[in-house]
């Protein structure tokens, strides 16, 4: 089984400007790409798990999301970072049409993580879930991910978020150092 870093997107990898769906809105958080390079070098799979309710709400299309995701994936690949899995939830209970559903994939439910664990043969005991909200921490716990990491680069940190997180970091840039410290 493989070890993995499960990554939220908005507020964790990129600045959350609210419903980011255009390339010109997308800015990687300082140090995030370098952190991903280090995590890759440490032997971790990198798995994106992102809620995208903007699709359900009609703010942007699934095609627009997929185009931005392809651009992000290529931008990372150009810097030597390959994402091993990309999982997203386009649903919301207040969504429109086919996207209006109470699904198992929308965080805080663990559906996306459980699917990745199964498809990519991931060991939850050696893996980390990284995100900026309590929903990310709850999804990690629901999937039995041993380590949940809350980052301060997105939504304001809540007491609930702190309680659910094993670790709270300034940003994902600090994650490789944390992991190295845990191993020593």
From Swiss-Prot:
Its cofactor is Mg(2+); Zn(2+). One of its GO terms (biological process) is lipopolysaccharide core region biosynthetic process. Its main location: cytoplasm. Mg(2+) binds at residues 8, 10, 132. It comes from the Bacteria. InterPro entries: HAD-like_sf (IPR036412), HAD-SF_hydro_IIIA (IPR006549), HAD_sf (IPR023214), Heptose_bisP_phosphatase (IPR004446), Histidinol-phos (IPR006543). Its EC number is 3.1.3.82. Substrate binds at residues 8-10, 16-19, 50-53, 106-107, 133. The record marks 106 as: Contributes to substrate recognition. GO terms for molecular function: D-glycero-beta-D-manno-heptose 1,7-bisphosphate 7-phosphatase activity; magnesium ion binding; zinc ion binding. The record marks 50, 107 as: Stabilizes the phosphoryl group. It is found in: Cytoplasm. Belongs to the GmhB family. Monomer. This is D-glycero-beta-D-manno-heptose-1,7-bisphosphate 7-phosphatase. It comes from Pasteurella multocida (strain Pm70). The gene is gmhB.
């Amino acid at each position: 089984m493989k070890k993995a870093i499960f990554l939220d997107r908005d507020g964790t990898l990129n600045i959350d400007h609210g419903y980011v769906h255009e390339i010109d809105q997308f800015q990687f958080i300082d140090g995030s790409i370098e952190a991903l390079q280090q995590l890759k070098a440490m032997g971790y799979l990198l798995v994106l798990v992102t809620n995208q309710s903007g699709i359900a709400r009609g703010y942007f299309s699934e095609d627009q999301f997929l185009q931005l995701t392809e651009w992000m994936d290529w931008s990372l690949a150009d810097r030597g970072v390959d994402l091993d899995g990309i999982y997203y939830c386009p649903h919301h209970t207040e969504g429109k049409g086919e996207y209006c559903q109470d699904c198992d994939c929308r965080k805080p439910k663990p559906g996306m993580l459980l699917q990745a664990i199964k498809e990519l043969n991931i060991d939850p005991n050696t893996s980390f879930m990284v995100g900026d909200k309590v929903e990310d921490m709850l999804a990690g716990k629901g999937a039995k991910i041993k380590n949940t990491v809350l980052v301060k680069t997105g939504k304001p940190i809540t007491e609930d978020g702190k309680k659910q997180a094993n670790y709270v970091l300034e940003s994902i840039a600090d994650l490789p150092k944390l992991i190295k410290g845990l191993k020593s």
